[in-house]
């Protein structure tokens, strides 16, 4: 089994997250914690659309996984007082799949497409007239007898979510009237989310314990909530049910999540470069062998947080571990 599947600190959604996260999700912008810039802009755009009795412009939400793009899409629908239909780029394999989704929409509905960057170009071309003119061009028949039929669609709002905005084609990206980047959360914002989640779970939690979980959550609510679930288990089995600072520190130590939110895979990657390659520079392919992961997995999954906190650098010559990482491990920085 791949390491990434079992990783507690993965920003990607897992089945257990989907099951338990639904009641945790805020329903309105007022309830939504963080993303103040995107939230305040959306408040204005939504209110203006409602005052004009129009559908909201199409919205593109982009940024790292686990930061609330799906939640924002559902909030947009709630604030507009309409239904939301959810699908994803990989789920729309043929133009006919998209046509079926579009023709089932009711006036004003929100269509949420997650991982929209993974739409095939032929499907994007079907989407263009739907976004611009609320119509669908369908080709009936084949060969010389083929003809195009235009179907009118009800006005709708497309909300697309992507972790790779640069992977969207320019024609698709240009058809979104609202572009909002979601940012990593501060420790205080994550602490508030942890306390709100504990309230939903009906679990008592100390404010210091909430802060400790927040500090180790990599700026990501999904990870914060996942850590709280596991700490809650320790509180129930090893304590009296209350999530205290003592229980939290013990649980996170046993889960191998250190004070900066690094886990055993991060340690293995960094220490591998330090001990085997004197801190680098070293090529990505060479790094991948010792930890048993493919190079693209390291680049897309493990490296972003290490780059974010300044423990790793990407250079033309390869990866280099920074002095901050040496300091974190209590190791002496090698002399050049």
Curated annotation (Swiss-Prot):
Subcellular location as annotated: Cytoplasm
Annotated region described as Small ATPAse domain (RuvB-S), given as residue ranges: 186-256
Catalysed reaction, written as an equation: ATP + H2O = ADP + phosphate + H(+)
One Gene Ontology term from the biological process aspect of the record: DNA recombination
One of the record's GO molecular function terms: ATP hydrolysis activity
Residues that bind ATP: 24-25, 66, 69-71, 132-134, 175, 185, 222
Binding-site residues for Mg(2+), renumbered to this chain: 70
UniProt-annotated stretches for the region Head domain (RuvB-H): 259-336
GO cellular component: cytoplasm; Holliday junction resolvase complex
Keyword list, A-Z: ATP-binding, Cytoplasm, DNA damage, DNA recombination, DNA repair, DNA-binding, Hydrolase, Nucleotide-binding
Enzyme Commission (EC) number: 3.6.4.-
Region described as Large ATPase domain (RuvB-L): 1-185
Cysteine disulfide partners in this protein: none
One Pfam family named in its UniProt record: AAA_lid_4
InterPro entries: AAA+_ATPase, AAA_lid_4, DNA_helicase_Holl-junc_RuvB, P-loop_NTPase, RuvB-like_N, RuvB_C, WH-like_DNA-bd_sf, WH_DNA-bd_sf
Main localization, broad class: cytoplasm
Binding-site residues, DNA: 314, 319
Domain comment quoted from the record: Has 3 domains, the large (RuvB-L) and small ATPase (RuvB-S) domains and the C-terminal head (RuvB-H) domain. The head domain binds DNA, while the ATPase domains jointly bind ATP, ADP or are empty depending on the state of the subunit in the translocation cycle. During a single DNA translocation step the structure of each domain remains the same, but their relative positions change.
HAMAP family cross-referenced by the UniProt entry: DNA_HJ_migration_RuvB (MF_00016)
Subunit: Homohexamer. Forms an RuvA(8)-RuvB(12)-Holliday junction (HJ) complex. HJ DNA is sandwiched between 2 RuvA tetramers; dsDNA enters through RuvA and exits via RuvB. An RuvB hexamer assembles on each DNA strand where it exits the tetramer. Each RuvB hexamer is contacted by two RuvA subunits (via domain III) on 2 adjacent RuvB subunits; this complex drives branch migration. In the full resolvosome a probable DNA-RuvA(4)-RuvB(12)-RuvC(2) complex forms which resolves the HJ.
Record-stated family: Belongs to the RuvB family.
Its biological purpose: The RuvA-RuvB-RuvC complex processes Holliday junction (HJ) DNA during genetic recombination and DNA repair, while the RuvA-RuvB complex plays an important role in the rescue of blocked DNA replication forks via replication fork reversal (RFR). RuvA specifically binds to HJ cruciform DNA, conferring on it an open structure. The RuvB hexamer acts as an ATP-dependent pump, pulling dsDNA into and through the RuvAB complex. RuvB forms 2 homohexamers on either side of HJ DNA bound by 1 or 2 RuvA tetramers; 4 subunits per hexamer contact DNA at a time.
Record protein name field: Holliday junction branch migration complex subunit RuvB
Organism of origin: Bacillus cereus (strain ATCC 14579 / DSM 31 / CCUG 7414 / JCM 2152 / NBRC 15305 / NCIMB 9373 / NCTC 2599 / NRRL B-3711)
């Amino acid at each position: 089994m791949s390491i990434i599947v079992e990783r507690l600190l993965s920003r990607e959604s897992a089945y257990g997250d989907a099951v338990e996260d639904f009641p945790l999700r805020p329903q309105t912008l007022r309830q939504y914690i963080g993303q103040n810039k995107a939230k305040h802009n959306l408040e204005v755009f939504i209110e203006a659309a409602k005052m004009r009795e129009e559908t909201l412009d199409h919205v593109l939400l982009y940024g790292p996984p686990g930061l609330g793009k799906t939640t924002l899409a559902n909030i947009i629908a709630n604030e507009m007082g309409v239904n939301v239909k959810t699908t994803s780029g990989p789920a729309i394999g043929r133009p006919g799949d998209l046509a079926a989704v579009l023709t089932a929409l009711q006036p004003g509905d929100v269509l949420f497409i997650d991982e929209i960057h993974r739409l095939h170009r032929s499907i994007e071309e079907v989407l263009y007239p739907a976004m611009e003119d609320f119509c669908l061009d369908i080709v009936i028949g084949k060969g010389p007898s083929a003809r195009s039929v235009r179907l009118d669609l009800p006005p709708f709002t497309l909300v697309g979510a992507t972790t790779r905005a640069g992977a969207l084609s320019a024609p698709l990206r240009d058809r979104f009237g609202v572009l909002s980047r979601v940012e990593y959360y501060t420790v205080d914002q994550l602490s508030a989310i942890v306390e709100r989640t504990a309230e939903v779970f009906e679990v008592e939690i100390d404010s210091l314990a909430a802060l400790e979980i927040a500090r180790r959550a990599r700026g990501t609510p999904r990870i914060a909530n996942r850590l709280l679930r596991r700490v809650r288990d320790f509180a129930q089995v090893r304590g009296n049910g209350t999530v205290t600072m003592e229980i939290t520190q013990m649980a996170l130590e046993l889960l191998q999540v250190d004070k900066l939110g690094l886990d055993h895979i991060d340690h293995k990657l960094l220490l591998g470069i330090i001990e085997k390659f004197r801190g680098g520079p070293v090529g990505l392919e060479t790094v991948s062998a010792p930890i048993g992961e493919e190079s693209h997995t390291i680049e897309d999954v493990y490296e972003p947080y290490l780059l974010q906190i300044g423990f790793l650098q990407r250079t033309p010559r390869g990866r280099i571990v920074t002095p901050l990482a040496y300091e974190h491990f209590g190791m002496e920085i090698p002399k050049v």
